[in-house]
Amino acid sequence: MWVFGYGSLIWKVDFPYVEKLVGYIMCYSRRFWQGSTDHRGVPGKPGRVVTLVEDPEGCVWGVAYRLPEGKEEEVKAYLDFREKGGYRTSTVVFYPKDPSIQPFNVLLYIGTCDNPNYLGPAPLEDIAEQILNAVGPSGRNTEYLFELANSLRNLVPEDADEHLFSLEKLVRQLSEAHRNLNHL
C-alpha cells in the first residue's frame, strides 16, 4: 500500500515506510482551505493547513510512501487518527517524477468541504494573517507553511504552486512588517 503526502506528510514523516518517491497526482490543486484546531491552531482560533480541491487542470506534487508489508493497517489507523480533522480517503493515480517508473495507485487523504473544520476559500491576505497568528499543539502555523514551501522547492524545483508560494511570500512580508512595527 502506498500513501500520498501533499502537506505535512512531505516533511514530517512519523510513520514507518520502506520506500518513498517524489511525483504528482492530477485533477487536484493544493489549497490552504482546511482548518486545524488540533495541530496548527486551537478551537476558536484555527490554523490553516492544506487540502486538495478538484481541478481538471490541476497537478499536485508530493511524496508517495510505500508502507511496510504487514504494517499497512497499523499505519493506516495511525494516519486516520493523525488526519482526524475531517479528512476522507480516496485512491488516485500517482505519477512518479522518474519517468522510468510506471504510474500506480496511492491512498490520498482529503479534507472535504462538508467537514466541520473546512474553512474554504478566502482572500489570500486573510489566509496569510490567519496563518501568521495561529499556533497549536504541533507548533506555529507559519512553520507548517514554510516547511511545506521549502520541501517542495527542494524536491521539485520546477513546481510553480502559485497558491502556496504566493502565500509564503505574503506571510513573510506580513511577518517582517509586524517585526518592524514592534521595533518602533
Curated annotation (Swiss-Prot):
Give the top-level enzyme category: lyase
Q: Which GO terms describe its molecular function?
A: glutathione specific gamma-glutamylcyclotransferase activity
Name the Pfam families for this protein: ChaC
Family matches, as InterPro entries: ChaC (IPR006840), GGCT-like (IPR013024), GGCT-like_sf (IPR036568)
Q: Which residues form the active site?
A: 83 (proton acceptor)
Enzyme Commission identifier(s): 4.3.2.7
Q: GO:BP terms for this protein? A: glutathione catabolic process
Q: Where does substrate bind?
A: 3-8
Q: Which SUPFAM superfamilies match?
A: Gamma-glutamyl cyclotransferase-like (SSF110857)
UniProt keyword annotation of Lyase present? yes
Tell me a GO cellular component: cytoplasm
Q: Which UniProt keywords apply?
A: Lyase
The reaction(s) catalysed by this protein are: glutathione = L-cysteinylglycine + 5-oxo-L-proline
Check the record and name the PANTHER family matching this protein: CATION TRANSPORT PROTEIN CHAC-RELATED, GLUTATHIONE-SPECIFIC GAMMA-GLUTAMYLCYCLOTRANSFERASE 2
**Function according to Swiss-Prot or TrEMBL:** Catalyzes the cleavage of glutathione into 5-oxo-L-proline and a Cys-Gly dipeptide. Acts specifically on glutathione, but not on other gamma-glutamyl peptides.
Q: Hey, which family's this protein in?
A: Belongs to the gamma-glutamylcyclotransferase family. ChaC subfamily.
Name it.
Putative glutathione-specific gamma-glutamylcyclotransferase 2
